[in-house]
Amino acid sequence: TLNMVADGAYDAFGKADTLFATINLAYVRQRLSLEISASFGSTQTGKSKGDFFTDVSTLHSTAFSLSARWQTKMPGHFLSFGISQPLRIENGHVMVNAPTGRNLSTEAFSFSQAALPLSPSGREIDIEIGHLFQGQNGLSLATNFAYRINPDHNAQAKGAIAFLSHIQLSF
């Protein structure tokens, strides 16, 4: 349900139903592998039973990844490249019933409804390159460099860089 959790005054819907589909394709050879994955989701909530949120439209979400890995001419060494988009709401909105004024003589509040979009301002794209060394006696060393464009799907966010490493010993 795309982490739609609410409690108390905000618990307006009680349930949400999500239909989610993922397609995976792989091409694997001795020295080269290619993988593609694409996910699509649709989430619908029940009718609102609260006063603050009056309606949530159907939410559509997507995610994808494309990766390639190949073995170098040096035994035990592999290089990889990947590009991906983490789960993102593509469209949908929530109707909010918000107070806009108050009549001082009757103490009655006036309300208006506004549609707030739930799709983020940007689209995060992650680009990653990596190196894997698989040595003898269970030793492996992986290093990856990643660059995130529009982190957290925020169009105003600066790009983020990450360096990851993993050492494994088996005995």
For each feature predicted by the language model, list its residue ranges.
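Outer membrane beta-barrel transmembrane domains
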Residues: 1-15, 20-26, 35-157
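Detector for repetitive beta-architecture
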Residues: 31-33
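Outer-membrane beta-barrel "beta-signal"
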Residues: 78, 158-171
